[in-house]
Each structure stands twice: as C-alpha cells, then as structure tokens.
Regions:
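N-terminal membrane topogenic signal
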Residues: 6-29, 56-57, 80-82
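Juxtamembrane "helix-exit" motif on the non-cytosolic side of transmembrane helices
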Residues: 36-47, 73-76, 99-110
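Structural signature of hydrophobic alpha-helical transmembrane segments
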Residues: 50-64, 119-129
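C-terminal ends of transmembrane helices
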Residues: 69-79, 134-144
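Cytoplasmic-side transmembrane-helix entry/capping segments in multi-pass membrane proteins
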Residues: 81-92, 144-152
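Alpha-helical transmembrane segments in multi-pass membrane proteins
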Residues: 103-132, 147-165
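Membrane-embedded catalytic scaffold of the fatty acid hydroxylase/desaturase
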Residues: 141, 147, 152-345
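Cytosolic-facing loops and C-terminal tails of multi-pass membrane proteins
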Residues: 330, 340-369
C-alpha cells in the first residue's frame, strides 16, 4: 500500500512524504546490506566484492542509517500519515539488531551460484543519484520521478541484478561448451597485441554487431518479439525503464555477446571497461534527458536515438537497433531518418502487454487464442 500510494504522485517539499519515502528506501537498502554482510558467499558478487572497499561500504551504511532515522523522525513530525516513518524505523531496528554497519564477516568459500544483492544496492544508489539528477537538470519531458509503471520497472531492476550470478554462470558454461572449438591461440594473441584502447573499440564494435543482429531477430521474428515486447511495453521513458526485460531475452543476449568476446580473447581489463561502458550507456540511453550530442549522434547511440527505437510512432517501428554505435543502423539502412528531434509516444502498438513483473514473464509463454 505504501508503494501503491506513490505511483504517479507529485511529491512536494514540506509535506513530510519525501522524507518518509527516502527514509524507507535507505533503511531497506541498509537492511539488505547487513544481510549481504552476513551471507557474502550467497548474496554478493565476487568481482564487485574484490573491487570495493569494505570499510567504505560500512561507512556508507552507517550514514544511510543515520539519514534514514533522521528523516523517519521528520516524517513523524511533518506528515499526518506516519506509516513511512514507522516502516523506516522498523527496518532500522531490524538492521541494527542484526549487527548494523559493524556486522562481522566470517571466513567463507564463494558459492558457484550467488545472488547479486550488493550489485543491486550499489547500482540503485549510484544510478538514482546520477540519473535522477540529470533528468531533473535537463529533462526532455516534465514527468514525476515516480511516474506510472515505476513499480514494474523497479521489480525488473531488482530481479535482473539479483540473478546476475546465475545468468553469468549459465552464459559462461554455454559459451565455453558451444564455442570452445572456435578458440584459436594465434587469433587471441593477435587481438591481445592491439593497444588497450584499440581492443576496447573492437570489443564494443564486435559486441554491438552481435547485439544488432539479435535485436533484429527479436523484432522481426514473431516468436522472439513476444519476449522482446516486454522491453518495449514501457510507455514512459526514464533511467529505470531500460530494466524492463524478460529473463529469457536477457540470458540469450548475454550468451550471444559473450561468444565473440570469449573466442577473440580480449584482455580482462578491456572486458571490465566494456562492462562499465555497457552498463552506463544502457541506462543513459533510456533517460528522460535532453542531452545535445551534435554530430556525435550519427556515430554513437544517444538517448534521442534510442528513444526513437522505443517509439510507437509508425516511422520508428523496427528502427535504430544498435546499442553503442549509431552508424551501424545507418550502414544497414535501419536508422530513423527525416523525423523531428524526439518521438511523441512510446510503448507497444496496441498496448497488449500486461503490467507487473510476474505477468510479463509469463506473457510470452501464453498460447494465443
């Protein structure tokens, strides 16, 4: 009920609601962080865990608990509806009872399969701070942060981050078994002799060509469109909308992109940089932000370019497939041309995809009547 009351609502300073909802969010993330500390072998991402400073994470958690508690009290004072403050303080109490920011971590063996709870927490905090700020400073359209459908997209965001370990495990095993025969040491050494920056450009290009091909299949083959339609069903574009994706499509795309990367043997640091760029660009290109790229919009994929891909306007159907380099669409004749700067409407023509994460995961599997 607390989340339902938020949808499409305009939040105004001075009402106490903003403080209440921020308090609940920070308290919930802090509690999840405590659980991740308790069960790191099952709830944290090995690669991410190796990169961050644990003491810094503890400090962030402590600050989050302080801010959450303070805003929860403010909610009690300023808002006639005390529910948010009560929920926040309940979550804070549980988090502290479980050890709070000082929770101890015992020695452990990493599980082969894990839930990316730490990845969800850190990415949600970072993306919210960066992209909500961008959308409010230079918005394309005036719309609420908690616009209609945000709950569905947040569910997708949560699940996609949580299952990252299982998806990567499945993709790695499939690719190594299916394409191990194609690995050739001489070819890998040739690629690794390129400069670091040249490898980065090459991996982006190779990955985008694979994604372009898969993306066209998702659109032009009816069976695959039923899965991909989930991603296109968002009628409002912002940084969170890009998370809306069917698990089957997510896994297939990961396998497709990983295959040439595995075969060509790029340097690990190049792959790490590629992953960062992919994550950032995927979110940026869905943002509700009026960012001017000038002539670069013909080279790289921009929010404007990708918004056209999500448009339900007739001129935009099955266009702008590329994920990184817009020139791929111009070369293959699938770029939107001669249109005004931004599309008018988004979503699936006919609006036949149901709302809700569970319904959307089940939708492609339903037999047409």
């Amino acid at each position: 009920m607390l989340l339902k009351n938020l949808e499409g609502g305009q939040l105004r300073f001075g009402e106490g609601r903003i403080s209440g909802y921020i308090a609940v969010s920070l308290a919930a993330l802090s509690l999840l962080g405590v659980l991740a500390f308790h069960f790191p072998e099952y709830l944290t991402t090995p690669e991410l865990r190796a990169a961050y400073d644990v003491e810094l994470i503890r400090l962030i958690m402590f600050i989050a608990l302080i801010i959450s508690g303070s805003l929860g009290l403010l909610n009690f004072v300023r808002n006639t509806n005390k529910r948010a403050g009560l929920v926040a303080w309940s979550l804070i109490t549980i988090a502290i009872a479980l050890g709070g920011h000082r929770v101890e971590v015992s020695d452990f063996e990493q599980s082969s399969a894990y839930l990316g709870l730490d990845w969800f927490i850190l990415d949600l905090l970072g993306s919210t701070l960066i992209f909500v700020f961008i959308e409010k400073i230079i918005p394309h359209r005036k719309q609420a942060i908690l616009r209609p459908e945000w709950q569905t997209d947040l569910h997708h965001f949560f699940v996609n981050h949580l299952i990252v370990g299982f998806v990567l495990l499945a993709a790695n095993q499939f690719v190594s078994n299916a394409f191990g025969w194609a690995v050739e040491r001489g070819s890998q050494e040739w690629v690794q002799n390129f400069s670091w920056f040249s490898q980065l450009l090459l991996v982006l290009l190779v990955a985008d060509l694979v994604q372009y091909a898969l993306h066209r299949v998702y659109h032009e083959v009816p069976f695959f469109w039923r899965f991909h339609a989930i991603h296109h069903s968002a009628k409002t574009m912002d940084w969170l909308a890009g998370s809306r994706q069917h698990i089957a499509e997510l896994t297939l795309t990961r396998c497709g992109v990983l295959a040439p990367i595995f075969i060509l043997g790029f340097d690990k640091s190049v792959i790490d940089a590629y992953i960062i760029i992919v994550g950032f660009q995927a979110v940026l290109n869905h943002t509700n932000a009026q960012i001017k790229f000038g002539w670069l919009k013909y080279i790289i994929v921009t929010p404007q370019f990708h918004h056209w891909h999500h448009s339900s306007d007739k001129a935009a159907i099955d266009r702008n497939y590329a994920a990184h380099f817009a020139f791929i669409d111009y070369i293959f004749g699938t770029a939107v041309r001669g249109q005004k700067e931004w599309p008018e409407a988004y979503g699936v023509v006919g609006d036949y995809v149901p709302e809700g994460w569970i319904k959307q995961q089940a939708f492609p599997l339903k037999v047409k009547s």
